[in-house]
Amino acid sequence: MIAFRGVSKVYTAGGREVAALRNVSLRVEAGEIHGVLGQSGAGKSTLIRCANLLERPTEGSVSVDGQDLLALSPEALRKARQGIGMIFQHFNLFGSKTVAANVAYPLEVAGTPREAIRERVEELLSLVGLSDKAQAYPSQLSGGQKQRVGIARALAPRPRVLLSDEATSALDPETTRSVLGLLRDINQKLGVTLLLITHQMDVVKAICDSVSVLERGRLVEQGKVTELLAHPSTRLHQLCFPAFAAPTDAPSGRRVALTLAGEHARRPLLGTLARQFDVDALLVEGAMERVGNTRVGRLLVDLQGSADAVSQALAYLREQGLTLEEAANG
């Protein structure tokens, strides 16, 4: 478990103070994948560097597995950091070392016996699919392979927590999907808690259980990804589903915006309106997104039928728990 409580970070630049983080409090539960989403300058990198005290907060506290890192002695902090692995955006591999030697490095620093290092390196290279690259050098690897080495190295000391600093932003879409799939597998197989920062909504949708949205150093919302996306008023929903374009034609019925999530996104709700209420639903605009193993969608529809029938159809949709907003006619 990771907990930030009232964390602020202020830098001094050019004789003035710049606040990178402003009173941020968030909690990442043990074993989950938590994303921190925000654009450049939002404070994401500062936050993740506070998670292992590469940056010390100006105010607030940071706890990992119940330990207040700021209260630890230098020796105790070094020991605590062994349980926190980090994956970097630009890999940070030693160019003069082989893949196996890069993975072995943190174990050598920790004084691990040579035979135990060899066994652990073999195990990790198998886990990340690079057993055949043990004696290769970073210059001989693709970007995705380099990141897999970085992941293996981060896992070498058997950390309970992995921090991912924009780990896929330098990769092409196909490689990104592959690396995200590997991170999800590691989370499920090893039970490692993963805190990742990203500016890419696709990363959040692909593997995150929960998410925090940062803007200008402030936490604007946090929660389960599917729950936030299911509510049009949330910032995450607005980032994922931009506002519908202004209609160029008058509605041909009562125009309604529907948000579908989970079971609702798999059911023929619009067909049900036609069969059960004699109401036709004309799709004006819409989008459907896959979020982990579920789907979330937002549709703009015109409901056509008698006034009573349309009212009954709307009542039915509300009874089903759908979020809907009715647009003004004309």
Swiss-Prot record:
Coiled coil: none
Chief localization: membrane
EC number: 7.4.2.11
Any one GO MF annotation of this record: ATP hydrolysis activity
Topological relation to the membrane, as annotated: Peripheral membrane protein
Recorded family membership: Belongs to the ABC transporter superfamily. Methionine importer (TC 3.A.1.24) family.
Keyword Membrane tagged: yes
Subcellular location: Cell inner membrane
CDD domains tied to this protein: ABC_MetN_methionine_transporter
Record-annotated ABC transporter domain positions: 2-241
Residues noted as binding ATP in the record, renumbered to the chain: 38-45
Key word Endoplasmic reticulum present: no
Protein name: Methionine import ATP-binding protein MetN
Reactions listed under catalytic activity: L-methionine(out) + ATP + H2O = L-methionine(in) + ADP + phosphate + H(+); D-methionine(out) + ATP + H2O = D-methionine(in) + ADP + phosphate + H(+)
Annotated function: Part of the ABC transporter complex MetNIQ involved in methionine import. Responsible for energy coupling to the transport system.
